[in-house]
Amino acid sequence: MNPIISAASVIAAGLAVGLASIGPGVGQGTAAGQALEGIARQPEAEGKIRGTLLLSLAFMEALTIYGLVVALALLFANPFV
């Protein structure tokens, strides 16, 4: 295998994981902060807010997992060879 392609695949895999985790990380922090603020304002709505928060956190985390899948594909099933 060409060493330049191999090096580019490793760099691209690192960027895929790194960039794929920035957005969901910021989004999860914002969502959790807003959920805590909403629970503090209306404690009686805690169950509904928590359920919505957990569902939205799962969807946000899926984006990071997609980045990991792309990185693993670049590392082990290299499409550029």
Curated annotation (Swiss-Prot):
Task: Answer whether the UniProt record assigns the keyword Nucleotide-binding to this protein.
Answer: no
The record's section on Pfam families has:
ATP-synt_C (PF00137)
An annotated Gene Ontology molecular function: proton-transporting ATP synthase activity, rotational mechanism
Positions of the record's site feature: Reversibly protonated during proton transport: E61
Q: Look up and give the membrane topology term.
A: Multi-pass membrane protein
Q: Any other noteworthy remark?
A: In plastids the F-type ATPase is also known as CF(1)CF(0).
What does the subunit section of this Swiss-Prot or TrEMBL entry state? F-type ATPases have 2 components, F(1) - the catalytic core - and F(0) - the membrane proton channel. F(1) has five subunits: alpha(3), beta(3), gamma(1), delta(1), epsilon(1). F(0) has four main subunits: a(1), b(1), b'(1) and c(10-14). The alpha and beta chains form an alternating ring which encloses part of the gamma chain. F(1) is attached to F(0) by a central stalk formed by the gamma and epsilon chains, while a peripheral stalk is formed by the delta, b and b' chains.
**Of which family is this protein a member?**
Belongs to the ATPase C chain family.
> What's the protein called, per UniProt?
ATP synthase subunit c, chloroplastic
